[in-house]
């Protein structure tokens, strides 16, 4: 039987050679038939300590490695890029300042 594989996001990397991966799945409510997000956290073995919080990783079922660890990181699918987010936030701040400046000029001109 093949081993189960899942894709999730690293939510904690504070332990040595272990990461906590949150896996999100959609289930249908039994009565209302609406699809709901369900999240479960798995402890996964990270041999090289290369995963960081925010990384999207693929984990695979393995033999029990500790009391709670039964998964291992197979590969990092996408790295988390905080620099890109900071640049986007700075651009948004600049645009807001420009808009606020234009609004102040319009109000100042109307009062005179």
Curated annotation (Swiss-Prot):
GO BP terms: translation
Gene Ontology CC annotations of this record: cytosolic small ribosomal subunit
Pfam families reported for this sequence: Ribosomal_S17 (PF00366)
Keyword terms: Ribonucleoprotein, Ribosomal protein, RNA-binding, rRNA-binding
InterPro entries, A to Z: NA-bd_OB-fold, Ribosomal_uS17, Ribosomal_uS17_bact/chlr, Ribosomal_uS17_CS
Single annotated GO MF: rRNA binding
Disulfide bonds: none
Gene3D superfamilies in the cross-refs: Nucleic acid-binding proteins
Function: One of the primary rRNA binding proteins, it binds specifically to the 5'-end of 16S ribosomal RNA.
Classification via NCBIfam families: PRK05610.1 (NF004123), uS17_bact (TIGR03635)
Self-association state and partner proteins as the record states: Part of the 30S ribosomal subunit.
Similarity remark: Belongs to the universal ribosomal protein uS17 family.
Protein name as it appears in the record: Small ribosomal subunit protein uS17
Species this protein is from: Thermotoga neapolitana (strain ATCC 49049 / DSM 4359 / NBRC 107923 / NS-E)
Organism taxonomic ancestry: Bacteria, Thermotogati, Thermotogota, Thermotogae, Thermotogales
């Amino acid at each position: 039987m093949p081993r189960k594989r899942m894709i999730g996001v690293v939510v904690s990397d504070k332990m040595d050679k272990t990461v906590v991966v949150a896996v999100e799945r959609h289930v249908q409510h039994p009565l209302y038939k609406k699809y709901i997000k369900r999240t479960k956290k798995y402890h996964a073995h990270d041999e090289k300590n290369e995963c960081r919080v925010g990384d999207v990783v693929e984990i695979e079922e393995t033999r029990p490695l500790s009391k709670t660890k039964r998964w291992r990181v197979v590969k990092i699918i996408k790295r988390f890029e905080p620099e890109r987010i900071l640049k986007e936030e700075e651009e948004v701040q600049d645009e807001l300042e420009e808009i606020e400046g234009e609004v102040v000029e319009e109000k100042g001109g109307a009062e005179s």
